[in-house]
Amino acid sequence: MSNNPLEAVTQAVNSLVTALKLPDESAKANEVLGEMSFPQFSRLLPYRDYNQESGLFMNDTTMGFMLEAIPINGANESIVEALDHMLRTKLPRGVPFCIHLMSSQLVGDRIEYGLREFSWSGEQAERFNAITRAYYMNAAATQFPLPEGMNLPLTLRHYRVFFSYCSPSKKKSRADILEMENLVKIIRASLQGASITTQAVDAQAFIDIVGEMINHNPDSLYPKRRQLDPYSDLNYQCVEDSFDLKVRADYLTLGLRENGRNSTARILNFHLARNPEIAFLWNMADNYSNLLNPELSISCPFILTLTLVVEDQVKTHSEANLKYMDLEKKSKTSYAKWFPSVEKEAKEWGELRQRLGSGQSSVVSYFLNITAFCKDNNETALEVEQDILNSFRKNGFELISPRFNHMRNFLTCLPFMAGKGLFKQLKEAGVVQRAESFNVANLMPLVADNPLTPAGLLAPTYRNQLAFIDIFFRGMNNTNYNMAVCGTSGAGKTGLIQPLIRSVLDSGGFAVVFDMGDGYKSLCENMGGVYLDGETLRFNPFANITDIDQSAERVRDQLSVMASPNGNLDEVHEGLLLQAVRASWLAKKNKARIDDVVDFLKNARDNDQYVESPTIRSRLDEMIVLLDQYTANGTYGQYFNSDEPSLRDDAKMVVLELGGLEDRPSLLVAVMFSLIIYIENRMYRTPRNLKKLNVIDEGWRLLDFKNHKVGEFIEKGYRTARRHTGAYITITQNIVDFDSDKASSAARAAWGNSSYKIILKQSAKEFAKYNQLYPDQFLPLQRDMIGKFGAAKDQ
C-alpha cells in the first residue's frame, strides 16, 4: 500500500467514476416489475362509486341500480301476469336485467338475536344457553341431528332476493341519471303491483351483499363487518385481501384467511341446458327445496340467478314472420311427410307472430344459473352436485355443469356483470335460452319462505328458512294475537306451546293454562308456577271487579251460562239478571255473592211492580231455581262463594287441571267462564306492555257447549284481548272440532278469531272425511303436506 496521500485520493476518485459508469441494476429491476401483470379479481368487477342523491351505482362503463325484495311465500296467475307485463312494457329492450336469490348460511347473528327471549335462568343458565346456541349453530353449519334412518338435508338458511340492472353510460350525464331514476320508480311500482315489496340498496349494503357473494367462508356463520370507505372504489371493498381464487376445469376453489385461520371453499356452477317443458312461478321454490319430497333439497349455500334480456319487438316479429312462412311453405310439400312435426311448428310460430304483432307477448333471452358453495372435498362436492341436479330434474329442469367455464358462470351471479358484456359472451357460447315473456316470468327466483318475526320460538320452515314465532309481534299486522292448534295425540301440541309459555314468562308476563291430563304440570313446577286441581278451585264472580259499568255484562253473561248451559235464557231473562248483578255489586262491592243476586231476583218477584206481569214473574222464578245450585247452600255453592278465591294476581303461571270436572258439564262450564272472566279482568288491570296468555288445552272437551251465548262470550273475549296485549291459545285434537257443522259455537268462535292457525298431524280417516265435506278448504298440495305429517317423537 502506498504512503503517498495524493495517490490514495486519486485511486478513490477513479473507483467512484468506474462505479458511475456501470449499468443501474436496481432501475432495471424496477422496470421489469412495472411490466409484470398481477391478476386481481377486483379488477374484473365494474363497481366504482355510488351516487347517494340518485341512489345509483356509477360503474366503469355502466350505470345502474340494485333493489332488495322481500321473497314472496307463493304466487298465482295475477302475480305472473303482472311480472309479464313489466317485462313487456317497462324494461328497456336489449339490456340485461338480473334476479338473484341468495341462500345464506350467515345466520349466527339472527340466531342469537332471535333466542334472546328464550334464554335460561338460574345457576346453570350460562351453560344451558351455550348448549342451545351451539345446537342451532351446528344445524346451520351442517344439519339438524335426525333419528337413525332419516336422512333429510334439514338446516338453517336465510333467503334474500335482489334485482340488479345497469345500462351503458360512460359520461354519466344528468339526462342518463334522470332516465335511470325514472326507470327505478317504474320497476319498483311494477314489482309492488306483483305483491313484491322492495327497497333500494345503498353503498354500505352493496359491499356487504356482494362481499358475501364473493368471499364465501364455509366455516363462518357470521357476516363480516365491512366499513365503507368513501375514498376507495367499490370493487376493491368487495374483495378480501386474502382472496385466492383458483380456476379448475370442473369447479373453482376459493381460499380465505380470517382470524388467523385458512379456509377453502369449492364453487360449483350449473346452468339450464334447455327450456323446461312447463314451469310455474309458485313451484320454482321446489327446485331448491321440495315440499312433498324434502330429501330433494339443496342444503348448501347457493345463489340462483336469472339473467334476462327482452329482445327488440320489431326484430322478433320479423323473425317469427319469416319462420312461419318458411315452415308453412314446407308443411305443404313432401318435406312434411319426412318431418311430420313441421305442421305443428308452423302453427306455433303463426300463433307467436300474432301475439308479437299485437303486443301480447315478447321474446326474452335468458340464462338461468345456480352457483353453489361447499367445503373443498370431492365427497361433499359430489353430494352437492347430485342434490342440485336431482332437485331440479324432479321439476323438469335439466341442468349441466359448464366445464372450463365455471369462472364465467360465477361472474353471472354478481350484480352488474351481465351489463358489462358478459351476457354477450353467454350468447356466443350458446348457453342462452329463448322463451316468451310469460314463460320467463314463471322462472323468476322470487319464492321463498318467510322468516316471520325477528325473535321468538325458533321454528325452521320446510325450506330451511330460519324463522321465529312471536304471536305478539306487531309487524305481522294480524287482527289479534290468538292461536288455534289442532293435532292428534303425539303430534307435538304441548311441545309447541310450552316454549311460547316460557317466552311470555321470561318477558315478565303471566300465563294461565286450562289443562286436562297433567300435560303442563312439569313445566309449571319448573317455572315456579301454581298448580291447582279443579276440585279445589274457589271463585267469587264479584271478587276482582273495579268498574261495574265495564264488567256488569260479562258477569251477567257468566251467570246466564251458569244458569242455563244450553242457552235457554232470552233477552228478558238477561235484562233482569243484569239488574241483579248491578244491584248486588252496588250494595256489597267485592263482597257480593250469588246469594245476593238470587235475593234480588226474589225481591223483584215479590215486588208490586210485577204483580200484573206473570211472564216476568215466571222468568224470575226460573232464574231463582237455576241459580240456586250455585248459592252458598247449593250443590256447587262451595265453588262460587269464597271470601278467598283460589286465583291470586301475584302468580306468574297458573295451571288448572279440569279433568276432574268433565263428568259434571254444568259445573265445568261455570268454572270455565269464571276462569275466563278472571283472566279478562286481570288482563284489563295490568299494564298493556305486559304479555298475557291463556292456553285452553283439549278445547274440544272444554268448549263443547251448544249454547250460542258461549260462542258470543268467547268471541268477545278473544277480540278484546289484543288491546291489552293478551292472547288465547286453543288446542283441539282435530280440525273438525274447530271448523265444521259439528263444532260448537264456542269452538268456531275460537277458530274464527285466531289469526294464527297451526295444523299438525291429523287422523287420516277424519281428515279425508273433512276434505270431502269441505273440498275448497285446502289446496291439493296442502292436503298432501298435511297427510305426510308424522308423530313428534319420530321427527
Model segments located where?
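Extended, folded cores of ATP/NTP-driven motor/assembly subunits in large transport
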Residues: M1-L443
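Glycine-rich phosphate-binding loop of nucleotide-binding enzymes
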Residues: G55-T62, A69-I72, L83-L91, R188, ...
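Short glycine-/polar-rich loops that comprise or flank the Walker A/P-loop
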Residues: G94-P96, G508-G509, G529, A651, ...
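P-loop NTPase motor core of the ASCE superfamily
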Residues: P147-R157, E553-K602, D739-Q795
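Anion (oxyanion) recognition and catalysis
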Residues: Q192, R393, L505, E525, ...
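A short beta-strand-to-loop transition that corresponds to the Sensor-1 phosphate-sensing loop
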Residues: G517, T730-I735, K761-S763
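Sensor-1/coupling segment of RecA-like P-loop NTPase cores
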Residues: A721-F738
